[in-house]
């Protein structure tokens, strides 16, 4: 990408980033259109390609920017002394909320990027996927096993992850999406699952 992109006013940078995040998140790499990105961002295609050269250039920039941005939000939101899995989970959700206040579709984009199977997109984002997974993995590695152990622990935790992801992505499609309201709803689901572990212990 052209480093002069960062010389643009922050509002214009974010408008372009948010437009691209949204289009790629909703459509995946293969079906995302640069025409839709420039329409969403209210810019010309010439300007988009001036800074990013190509569709894959935009996509790889988003992958790098998203992985780094969310890692910073995680580092701000996480108490490194906390060992309870569900309290850590809430901190991660707080980091996601803070991220989505500025970039509503960033986590949605990251989730679709992890599942992307287009060869060019996969090759361009391999390192960023590792960076994201390492950041998340480091956070959860601090959790003490007894805080989430039980006969159905794996199923419960997978169900929780899938529920939070689906809820957030479903609500993002609604123009009235609010990051703080989404955070509160997600925390309520975390509390439900945490309660199940307490009953089983």
Predicted regions and their residues:
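Short secondary-structure transition hinges
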Residues: 94-137, 173
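Generic hydrophobic, amphipathic alpha-helix propensity
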Residues: 12-20, 37, 62-66, 70-74, ...
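Hydrophobic/aromatic-rich alpha-helical bundle segments in the mid-to-C-terminal region
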Residues: 107, 111, 122, 144-191, ...
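Amphipathic, non-transmembrane alpha-helical scaffold segments
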Residues: 9, 17, 63, 67, ...
